[in-house]
Curated annotation (Swiss-Prot):
PTM characteristics: Under oxidizing conditions two disulfide bonds are formed involving the reactive cysteines. Under reducing conditions zinc is bound to the reactive cysteines and the protein is inactive.
Main location: cytoplasm
A GO term from the CC aspect: cytoplasm
Transmembrane as UniProt keyword: no
Classification of source organism: Bacteria, Bacillati, Cyanobacteriota, Cyanophyceae, Synechococcales
Organism: Prochlorococcus marinus (strain MIT 9515)
Gene3D superfamilies reported for this sequence: Hsp33 domain (3.55.30.10), HSP33 redox switch-like (3.90.1280.10)
GO terms (BP aspect): protein refolding
Localization terms from the record: Cytoplasm
Protein name, per record: 33 kDa chaperonin
Length: 300
């Protein structure tokens, strides 16, 4: 089954619920970037977080950029996600592997805190008009879910709960995804709604296990927490949306990037190499700029 976003509301429209599946997008990123299982999990979590944020944007060409700058061995990450469900991204150290750590439930987990270290989560929301909205918060623990919840609390003052996880079995990524539950802005001061959100979300003991057991049925995950969702609040067409890894790079963008070099640099490339190869950081696609194309830039 393909990746997707599912939307719903509860409490007569007072609580917004969004669930996202990013399994295939994460697998594609793993293949393109040569990611380890640790970095696959981290980037998959960042994919889920970015898409959850982008899902609330009003216009389809709206975009969210999620960047982590930190002192950990991961060396940061960058994700670009659209309201249209398209996502791409990369990490600074794709091959990173660390020892697993034991959790409170005596299970073993990736050491996200050590991988990311201390630093900052930066979120940019771009609606495609006016100045993009930018906000930065300190990392909480590097597991992305709590970091995103901190961003929503400090930057948007919205009571929210964020769950993000994945399941890896027999060296295969089985599933990756997330869930966002938040009191809508007009209801954020309603103590009963805030209490309801807190009580329902306490029922989630392990989102990764819930995601795995759901067999990609995101609506069932939502209904496990809020069985009384508002069925008619969102049209069927708007409720579900496709998600996929897709990059916006192109040969023309590569040519435009080359044109920003001065003529001396272009002549040096032409003399030494006779061509140029540009590699997209987001997807690793390669674009060859040949002798004639570079020569044309110099003459322009």
């Amino acid at each position: 089954m393909g990746d997707k976003i599912v939307r719903a509301t509860a409490a007569n429209g007072g609580i917004r619920l969004v669930a996202v599946l990013t399994t295939n997008a994460t697998r594609e990123a793993k293949k393109r970037h040569g990611l380890s299982y640790l970095t696959s999990s981290i980037l998959g979590r960042a994919f889920s977080a970015s898409l959850l944020l982008a899902s609330s944007m009003k216009i389809m060409h709206g975009r969210v950029t999620l960047r982590v700058r930190s002192d950990g061995p991961l060396k940061g990450l960058l994700v670009d996600a659209g309201r249209d469900g398209k996502v791409r991204g990369y990490v600074g150290n794709p091959n990173l592997e660390l020892d697993l750590v034991k959790t409170k439930s005596n299970k073993y987990s990736f050491d996200f805190t050590k991988a990311l270290g201390t630093g900052y989560l930066n979120i940019i929301r771009d609606n495609g008009f006016g100045e993009p909205f930018t906000s930065t918060v300190e990392l909480v623990n590097g597991n992305i879910a709590e970091d995103l919840a901190s961003y929503l609390y400090h930057s948007e003052q919205t009571p929210s709960a964020v769950f993000i996880g994945e399941k890896i079995q027999n060296k295969n990524l089985i599933c990756s995804g997330g869930l966002l539950a938040q009191v809508l802005p007009k209801k954020e001061t309603d103590p009963l709604l805030v209490s309801l959100l807190e009580d329902r979300c306490k029922e989630i003991n392990s989102f990764s296990e819930d995601l795995f057991e759901s067999k990609d049925d995101l609506l069932s995950i939502i209904k496990n927490i809020f069985p009384d969702i508002d069925d008619k609040s969102i049209s069927e067409n708007a409720r579900t949306q496709e998600v996929r890894f897709e990059c916006r790079c192109s040969k023309q963008r590569s040519l435009n990037a080359m044109k920003m070099l001065d003529k001396d640099e272009l002549e040096d490339i032409l003399k030494k190499e006779g061509k140029a190869e540009l590699v997209c950081e987001f997807c690793k696609n390669k674009y060859l700029i040949n002798f004639e194309e570079i020569e044309e830039m110099i003459k322009a």
